[in-house]
Amino acid sequence: MRILGIDPGLQTTGFGVVDVDGHRLRYVASGTIRTTGRATGLALGDLPGRLKVLFDGVSEVAARYQPSTAAVEIIFVNVNPQSTLLLGQARGAALTALVNANLPVAEYTALQMKKAVVGHGRAAKSQVQEMVRRLLELPGLPGTDAADALGLAITHAHAGAAMARVGEVAQLTRRQHAMYKAGRSY
């Protein structure tokens, strides 16, 4: 399974792609999508243009790496309501690009991601970077946005493995129930 993690942001959106085979994680790619500056020619005030750059960037990453699923960070309510609204719009552009690519999308809070990757939800960005580097056996630290995106992909891989185990237990329980009803022991 190939998972695309997205850490949405209006100025910089991180992405990370991880392959999962059983319990093995393999790094595929990571990077950032920037919505301002020389590369885009857009100013900070051009919100619609920046959202289009973000949508197109996420669409391009999804087309290039062909993930089977995606994981996106759920935003928190910031002290500044305007910042929260702007981040929500960026997140909406990223989600729309993923859904447009027919990808199932899972959502995780930063706390859930940090707990899954580092072991506790109050981890610093540097701790997330270091654990992502170790888990994916990277030669160097990824940038903070890319590390968060890779962390989301890792979180989803762990959640998928846990759900598969729950499914196996449910299958076993159904089988045991059927055997019990048929009068056989299990």
Swiss-Prot record:
Belongs to the RuvC family. Binds 2 Mg(2+) ion per subunit. SUPFAM superfamilies: Ribonuclease H-like. Pfam families: RuvC (PF02075). PROSITE patterns: RUVC (PS01321). One of its GO terms (cellular component) is Holliday junction resolvase complex. The RuvA-RuvB-RuvC complex processes Holliday junction (HJ) DNA during genetic recombination and DNA repair. Endonuclease that resolves HJ intermediates. Cleaves cruciform DNA by making single-stranded nicks across the HJ at symmetrical positions within the homologous arms, yielding a 5'-phosphate and a 3'-hydroxyl group; requires a central core of homology in the junction. The consensus cleavage sequence is 5'-(A/T)TT(C/G)-3'. Cleavage occurs on the 3'-side of the TT dinucleotide at the point of strand exchange. Mg(2+) 1 binds at residues 7, 145. It is found in: Cytoplasm. It comes from the Bacteria. Its EC number is 3.1.21.10. The gene is ruvC. HAMAP family: RuvC. Coiled coil: none annotated. It catalyses: Endonucleolytic cleavage at a junction such as a reciprocal single-stranded crossover between two homologous DNA duplexes (Holliday junction). Gene3D superfamilies: Ribonuclease H-like superfamily/Ribonuclease H. GO terms for molecular function: crossover junction DNA endonuclease activity; DNA binding; magnesium ion binding. Mg(2+) 2 binds at residue 73. Its cofactor is Mg(2+). This is Crossover junction endodeoxyribonuclease RuvC. Homodimer which binds Holliday junction (HJ) DNA. The HJ becomes 2-fold symmetrical on binding to RuvC with unstacked arms; it has a different conformation from HJ DNA in complex with RuvA. In the full resolvosome a probable DNA-RuvA(4)-RuvB(12)-RuvC(2) complex forms which resolves the HJ. One of its GO terms (biological process) is DNA recombination. NCBIfam families: ruvC (TIGR00228). Keywords: Cytoplasm, DNA damage, DNA recombination, DNA repair, DNA-binding, Endonuclease, Hydrolase, Magnesium, Metal-binding, Nuclease. The active site is at 7, 73, 145. Its main location: cytoplasm.
